[in-house]
């Protein structure tokens, strides 16, 4: 495993650990998800260069578009829950009643 692959795997793992362990606020969970998406984007951007192939060049752009949609939807949900509940604490939200 090259050092570049190790750093991207470490960044993804740290983002995943952040999502699983630091779920007190919705904003921190969204930031950890964005970190995971950024590490996936960087990994998918460098993968076709290492293979010297042009067949997978559109995959990072597709992932970038989906992560932008995910960020917009997450921020819209955070604004809606903070307006209705007054906070973005995930412990105070009962998602079955929303």
From Swiss-Prot:
One of its GO terms (molecular function) is NADH dehydrogenase (ubiquinone) activity. It is a multi-pass membrane protein. One of its GO terms (cellular component) is respiratory chain complex I. It catalyses: a ubiquinone + NADH + 5 H(+)(in) = a ubiquinol + NAD(+) + 4 H(+)(out). Its main location: mitochondrion. InterPro entries: NADH_UbQ_OxRdtase_chain4L/K, NUOK/Mnh_C1-like. The chain crosses the membrane at residues 26-46, 60-80. Its EC number is 7.1.1.2. Core subunit of the mitochondrial membrane respiratory chain NADH dehydrogenase (Complex I) which catalyzes electron transfer from NADH through the respiratory chain, using ubiquinone as an electron acceptor. Part of the enzyme membrane arm which is embedded in the lipid bilayer and involved in proton translocation. This is NADH-ubiquinone oxidoreductase chain 4L. The lineage of its organism: Eukaryota, Metazoa, Chordata, Craniata, Vertebrata.
């Amino acid at each position: 495993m090259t050092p570049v692959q190790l750093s991207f795997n470490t960044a993804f793992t740290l983002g995943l650990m952040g999502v699983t362990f630091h779920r007190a606020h919705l904003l921190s969970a969204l930031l950890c998800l964005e970190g995971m998406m950024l590490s996936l984007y960087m990994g998918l951007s460098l993968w076709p260069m290492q293979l010297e192939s042009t067949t997978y060049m559109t995959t990072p752009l597709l992932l970038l578009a989906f992560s932008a949609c995910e960020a917009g939807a997450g921020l819209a949900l955070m604004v809606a829950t903070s307006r209705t509940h007054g906070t973005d604490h995930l412990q105070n939200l009962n998602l079955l009643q929303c």
